[in-house]
């Protein structure tokens, strides 16, 4: 046997890791119109994943770094699941999405280990955590390599928290009928207990993706932030997303009187995208425990119930929805029927009067969240505020919108 053949035999993978785009087997819609959204990025020809530059830059990644990693993926001549899609390289090797972003994360992890300045080291660890999360994106169930990247992200995040300003505590919450879940409580400088925002994130993000929100908007106002992962991902991976989408967050809310660092009489919820579905449910079901609920680009009715709206949404996002619902090989018709049950209007909540103050921010022509969803939320509240966020310039208006939202929350908490 030649040396080359021997090497191939010795280092031949024992099994192939599933490639991300193959994990959800739905009937495709075919050609789709291009999509651009402030919170979700945009569809780019020849990419399975939506490229979410705004949010990645907002989380601290340099635009040039994003382009460098994308270039490595594009230039790979390795085998792909779909030759027309750059980010479908099979196996953990050069050109594979998870491999390239995790490799980039390791560069920053090494910088963090070598850096003697604790605060700068913390910044490098945070950068690595963010890159590992991008490696795992969009966090589909059963993506073994992505789950390993998520674990590395959580480890890097814990290292970062030990070195950055303020205090972070990892907390475990008991949920009857299943496994406990883990959350992170971020606390500003000073003496607690602190007014606290319970973060309800999007379905394609991890709880560790929201440090920028805490550092830039809540901490300067003396507000703590508590995060948990959405059902079926991260530390909540043993829980499936159900129509009772707020189940985990409700149990966390009920546990807050026993958390000494949290002023449980001054708690608000903040929901991004599908996280707004959770936050608005909390506004109705746990109104005595909440001072306010804020939403950004909420997914509470139209996308869940309108077939035309669903047709405008990229394949990747529908795959995320199917994955969270545990419908990996369901037909599109079955998925549509199930999604309809998650509409808060269909559930009989939205449209009824809600005593909790609610704000909802939206962008015009948002394919995921039309203005009507935000109007439905704010008109249902006894104290509602509707906030339109202009699209361009996208980064500046995103920051301005978050400043206004956190200011609104502060007035109701402090």
From Swiss-Prot:
GO molecular function: carboxylesterase activity
Pfam families per record: FrsA-like
Superkingdom of the source species: Bacteria
Record's catalysed reaction(s): a carboxylic ester + H2O = an alcohol + a carboxylate + H(+)
Organism for this UniProt entry: Escherichia coli O139:H28 (strain E24377A / ETEC)
Entry EC number(s): 3.1.1.1
Enzyme class: hydrolase
This protein's name: Esterase FrsA
PANTHER family listed in its UniProt record: DIENELACTONE HYDROLASE DOMAIN-CONTAINING PROTEIN-RELATED, ESTERASE FRSA
Entry keyword set: Hydrolase, Serine esterase
Biological function: Catalyzes the hydrolysis of esters.
UniProt similarity note: Belongs to the FrsA family.
